Amino acid sequence: MSSRRWFHPTISGIEAEKLLQEQGFDGSFLARLSSSNPGAFTLSVRRGNEVTHIKIQNNGDFFDLYGGEKFATLPELVQYYMENGELKEKNGQAIELKQPLICAEPTTERWFHGNLSGKEAEKLILERGKNGSFLVRESQSKPGDFVLSVRTDDKVTHVMIRWQDKKYDVGGGESFGTLSELIDHYKRNPMVETCGTVVHLRQPFNATRITAAGINARVEQLVKGGFWEEFESLQQDSRDTFSRNEGYKQENRLKNRYRNILPYDHTRVKLLDVEHSVAGAEYINANYIRLPTDGDLYNMSSSSESLNSSVPSCPACTAAQTQRNCSNCQLQNKTCVQCAVKSAILPYSNCATCSRKSDSLSKHKRSESSASSSPSSGSGSGPGSSGTSGVSSVNGPGTPTNLTSGTAGCLVGLLKRHSNDSSGAVSISMAEREREREREMFKTYIATQGCLLTQQVNTVTDFWNMVWQENTRVIVMTTKEYERGKEKCARYWPDEGRSEQFGHARIQCVSENSTSDYTLREFLVSWRDQPARRIFHYHFQVWPDHGVPADPGCVLNFLQDVNTRQSHLAQAGEKPGPICVHCSAGIGRTGTFIVIDMILDQIVRNGLDTEIDIQRTIQMVRSQRSGLVQTEAQYKFVYYAVQHYIQTLIARKRAEEQSLQVGREYTNIKYTGEIGNDSQRSPLPPAISSISLVPSKTPLTPTSADLGTGMGLSMGVGMGVGNKHASKQQPPLPVVNCNNNNNGIGNSGCSNGGGSSTTSSSNGSSNGNINALLGGIGLGLGGNMRKSNFYSDSLKQQQQREEQAPAGAGKMQQPAPPLRPRPGILKLLTSPVIFQQNSKTFPKT
């Protein structure tokens, strides 16, 4: 689990019950400090309408449930029982930990880095900070406490911040009501270590990693000036350190639309079906873009907190790898793209010792060790006592993490797949198998420039050669052919109903349909008289000539349709290749679309408690093609688009929770009608004739699978199109429709819908109220039947519709509020806990 936001350090058992009843659902859980046993913890889980409390023992060396598996940290314990489901009552009933109930950050200040280990904090500050740079993070060993990490010359000092009696202190001296007050105090009054070193808090080291659910607070902070600061930092870090020799060659220069926007050599697409005797025949200005592994290079969660982290190498391999890696690798605990290319390391290229170790390694390891103060190369940490006024500090690395060997992963396999270099340590067939395995989990993109068609050069043929070679079935064009009187992209397709030959490619435009935001064209493409393939061309046409779109919803809707198409092609067995994205230069708008889709894809897989890092994601994709996300305005737009998506998702979940409380049962909800006849509807073929929504013991709230198909933004496609790799932590999300027959109660949420619809209208009063509630959110339909205004409706409009809905209902009887069990009676579960693995029953405590 990438976040520990399920830990609520300040609430009691009564408050935990109330919180779970009001905001949670079946399977929601949180962890808190024990009210009866200082130093221990309690896991509170909602099961139906009851809340079960499970005691967690902490003896100073390990955490356990009074028996069973032992864990070094509380996050390891929670992660284990979420994934393995071995927690049962004595009567055999399972206690499922489905979805964490997120706790608000203790502060919105950007110097707070959340669940960051001491080792990671040291690397960040020593690599990128200055003398006096500081940050605050959560304590790895004592949940509920925090650590202040400060750079003092060539070392990092860690000062423990205690949470006691609803106050913060550093082990002595004054107490403060908030972390901000504490930091402000020690900015003015520096601490002094026992060795005499003065610890100055000069400048904050601001975080870019955040919990997805907390994006509103982060955007509010960035609006004050942080956007410019983050983007400028990104510009300085994204130096061109990769070769672009092929693009500079004389025979290839005319193929570049812009002289200095060239593809990196290590990720560029190479054309195979060409006349190799012609110099530069295999060159095209295009790069592969993808995540090397799940969250690799930008999901900065500590590997020591993950039970599924990579197996550590033997000392020889680790030392050799560490010596080869650059400072950026050390910073991220991962092998960066450049080092991966230089050394051609794959995860399975370790020595025999490492392979044997991977078979026998236990799942649970100690992730922390104690040590005294050390310089930047230190190896351990532990709480100590120093300072002139009882300041508790930790002088040295806080939480050492296991170095991973060769975590460049699938990306290297991908690069070697398209490389003429056969000297790598691993065969092409092994890289192919690895690439196929991870292709199922992560999308690959091709970022390229707009086509050129002049008397001197024609790249249209090369473009279609690449599309055919890569089996690309979806092309995303984010620019007009002409903007401000200048050609941005040559037309590389024929008019509707016509065919055209481009070299060996024959293109037939079968259909062309337009919405208010984009045009969808369907092509039949054949190459060298081979059987034709269906290829879909999504042409986004409302990006303004200057700046970015005012409404992120239009981009989210567009990406939703793109990903829905890609997922349907995969289900049809066509095995679509990378999504090809281009604008004019292939870096600005192209990068913006790709990064938004990557971030949302992560949220779809891991839920709202996942930690995202927009700046680091852009830094990662820029290591594969230079300049992606070109301007500060585009950088802001990525934040706003992700924020809009999360706000809409949260509003949708709340609406569905409220609908469940009313108690109505919906069945036979059908979506019918022709698609494509209305220019305002999504131009997609009909694929879902009827969807039934029936009551179940499982609460109808979103799962990771139901949030999408693993294709980023395919909302609702989980009704049979779920991503098999999606996390199980999210609850199921039903597809619902507005009722158009209840005196207009839900109609505003159904405008511009993706096809006609009919709903069951029995018991009109409560049915109308629920549909008004759900209709006001503007829910997107599953599969091909998308509500075109799902993301575009602002939350303010949604709230207005919800407030107006009861008035529009006239004299319709309002449903009685649902009955809830009164919180206050703690059902402490201390004895009936059974662990399936060992079939043990543990005694009462």
Curated annotation (Swiss-Prot):
Q: Where is the protein localized? A: Cytoplasm
Give the recorded effect for residue 119 to T.
In strain: Kenya-HLa3, Kenya-HLa6, Kakamega-b1 and Makindu-b1
Entry EC no(s): 3.1.3.48
Q: Which reaction does it catalyse?
A: O-phospho-L-tyrosyl-[protein] + H2O = L-tyrosyl-[protein] + phosphate
Q: Which residues carry this modification: Phosphoserine?
A: 419
Among its keywords, does the record have Cytoplasm? yes
Q: Where is the Tyrosine-protein phosphatase domain?
A: 227-645
The UniProt entry's GO CC annotations, sorted and at most eight, read: cytoplasm
Q: Which keywords has UniProt assigned to this entry?
A: Cytoplasm, Developmental protein, Hydrolase, Phosphoprotein, Protein phosphatase, Repeat, SH2 domain
Q: Which domain of life is it from?
A: Eukaryota
Domain called SH2: residue spans:
6-101, 111-205
Q: In which tissues is it expressed?
A: Expressed uniformly throughout all tissues during embryogenesis.
Active-site residues? 583 (phosphocysteine intermediate)
Q: Where does substrate bind?
A: 545, 583-589, 630
Query: What does this protein do, in the record's words?
Result: Required in all receptor tyrosine kinase signaling pathways. Functions downstream of the receptor tyrosine kinase torso, acting in concert with D-Raf via tailless. Also functions downstream of Egfr (epidermal growth factor receptor) and btl (fibroblast growth factor receptor). The SH2 domain suggests that csw effects its role by mediating heteromeric protein interactions. Maternally required for normal determination of cell fates at the termini of the embryo.
Into which family does the record put it? Belongs to the protein-tyrosine phosphatase family. Non-receptor class subfamily.
The misc remark on file is: The PTPase domain is interrupted by a PTPase insert which shares no homologies with other PTPase proteins. This PTPase insert is reminiscent of the kinase insert within the kinase catalytic domains of several receptor tyrosine kinases.
The UniProt subunit note reads as follows:
Interacts with drpr isoform A.
Q: What is this protein called?
A: Tyrosine-protein phosphatase corkscrew
**Species of the source:** Drosophila melanogaster (Fruit fly)
